[in-house]
Amino acid sequence: VNDALKGTFGRHRKIMPFESGSVEALRQTVRAKAAGLNRHSLGHGEIAESEWRAAGIAAPDLEAMRRYRLERIRTELKRRDYAGALLYDPINIRYATDSTNMQLWVAHNPTRHCFVATDGPIVLFDYFSCEHLSDHSGMVDEVRPAVSWIYLYGGELTEKRVRRWASEIADLVRQHGGGNLRIAVDHLDPEGTAELARLGISLGNGEAVMENARLIKSPDEILAMRRAIVACEAAMREMETALKPGISENELWAELHRGNIARGGEWIETRLLASGPRTNPWFQECSARLVEAGDFVAFDTDLIGPYGFCADLSRTWLCGDVRPTPEQGELFALAADQIAHNTTLIKPGVTFRELVERSQVPPSDCFANRYGVLYHGVGLADEYPTLPHAMDWTDDTPDGVLQAGMVLCVESYIGRLGGHEGVKIEEQVLITEIGNEKLSNYPLDERLIAG
């Protein structure tokens, strides 16, 4: 679209009959206009950019990041002898194409999917008239309207829609698979599985492909993650400023949402904020409870921020201009010590089993209330691996080896069984060639550190 058209197209246009052949030309002009106004093309805004400049974090090379991700996917597909991958998880589609469309809605309404050929094109099946939403990335070779066969669209005729959908997928596999009819699929309902099998297409575990592809982050991905964490921590600062006696948990949680969206972030996965007696046991969702002076306020961000990266941090604050009680100080010290000790253990070459066996755990009167995991991977969301306490390790817990480029979250929850309050702390840590680097920087509450 020329520069003059970019700013004025469609603003004063009158409805009139099209001349023969004009519709497709206009459609392409509309698509180019819409692509240039896509939120990914417009960027994250001056609030976020100014904070990133102040933090000294350079912009990631998004083209290099996208190429790296596609190569990671195709390496896994080749290693596992697949002709391609059929992806429904919106986060996997984001990883493959760096495009988004109604991410939460399509997570529970499968109306958008993507086929990544091991040696061939990326074909994105998107919501109707959404071709412009992937043009910015340069990764998608073709956009087609998706055939959705969820009951919302198909009703009692779903079986017919499944056949139409499967025929298109099978044709792609035969056209680009070089005779290989095996594909990896991340999420698929049984009707689709059965129909693809009837057409001779063999299915394998697409989650294994994508989780292993996403495991090792490129330098540009780490830059994007650093920026997401800076944005998250800026929103946390606004949240802490708003923390006064009398504010509701819901109002406080809304500050984190507002700060994330204002900086070009995307959504928050959970509602994990609790105060006072609601901090023990953990996993209360935030509520209308009014926070009181002297309360612990504990939260887990679980935030999908700028660039789609997860900033997964936890903090526990003390509400009001007060000093902590001895019990609060002791609980906080136990959690902070556990995080500090377990972070020092993270380095390349350590096995998952070795890591958990060396890890510090809650004391006996808090152990029954322990958090479900000691560590977990993180990237575009919580990712593989998830590492439990040593005593929770079972014969179906996968072992592995820590590698440079992985990012782990280190978890601690300390609350006595039957106690009044509890402490949640979580840090995000990059594994480097020689050890680790803590990516999260938000300070702990100084009053609680001092005890």
Language-model-detected regions and their locations in the chain:
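Active-site neighborhoods and metal-handling regions in enzymes and metal-associated proteins
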Residues: 1-451
